[in-house]
Amino acid sequence: MAERFSSRLADVIRRPLITEKATRALEMNQYTFEVDPRAAKPDIKAAVEHLFDVKVIGVSTMNPPRRTRRVGRFAGRRSQVKKAVVRLAEGNSIQLFPES
């Protein structure tokens, strides 16, 4: 695991991504998260296993292109994001939606 995240695994995962595609992937025991752009796959795996107490069998990552945003005549770019799709072992799950 990379040195930069060894003491603070909670900083690797920023938030879960809830989209139509990510919701469909939940049926196949795959969860989608927005993660720190500097995080490597072993960092993401260790963070998910530590935070949610589950067994991870695979991690896929993607770096979508940054998007340009305008405010009046000034153009800027949104911050870099990295998405990770985490596959869990059979019988494991993460409670994303609280029971009410």
Swiss-Prot record:
<keyword id="KW-0689">Ribosomal protein</keyword>
<dbReference type="InterPro" id="IPR013025">
    <property type="entry name" value="Ribosomal_uL23-like"/>
</dbReference>
<comment type="similarity">
    <text>Belongs to the universal ribosomal protein uL23 family.</text>
</comment>
<keyword id="KW-0694">RNA-binding</keyword>
<dbReference type="InterPro" id="IPR012678">
    <property type="entry name" value="Ribosomal_uL23/eL15/eS24_sf"/>
</dbReference>
<keyword id="KW-0699">rRNA-binding</keyword>
<protein>
    <recommendedName>
        <fullName>Large ribosomal subunit protein uL23</fullName>
    </recommendedName>
</protein>
<comment type="function">
    <text>One of the early assembly proteins it binds 23S rRNA. One of the proteins that surrounds the polypeptide exit tunnel on the outside of the ribosome. Forms the main docking site for trigger factor binding to the ribosome.</text>
</comment>
<comment type="subunit">
    <text>Part of the 50S ribosomal subunit. Contacts protein L29, and trigger factor when it is bound to the ribosome.</text>
</comment>
<dbReference type="InterPro" id="IPR001014">
    <property type="entry name" value="Ribosomal_uL23_CS"/>
</dbReference>
<dbReference type="InterPro" id="IPR012677">
    <property type="entry name" value="Nucleotide-bd_a/b_plait_sf"/>
</dbReference>
<dbReference type="GO" id="GO:1990904">
    <property type="term" value="C:ribonucleoprotein complex"/>
</dbReference>
<keyword id="KW-0687">Ribonucleoprotein</keyword>
<dbReference type="GO" id="GO:0006412">
    <property type="term" value="P:translation"/>
</dbReference>
<dbReference type="GO" id="GO:0003735">
    <property type="term" value="F:structural constituent of ribosome"/>
</dbReference>
<dbReference type="Pfam" id="PF00276">
    <property type="entry name" value="Ribosomal_L23"/>
</dbReference>
<dbReference type="GO" id="GO:0005840">
    <property type="term" value="C:ribosome"/>
</dbReference>
<dbReference type="GO" id="GO:0019843">
    <property type="term" value="F:rRNA binding"/>
</dbReference>
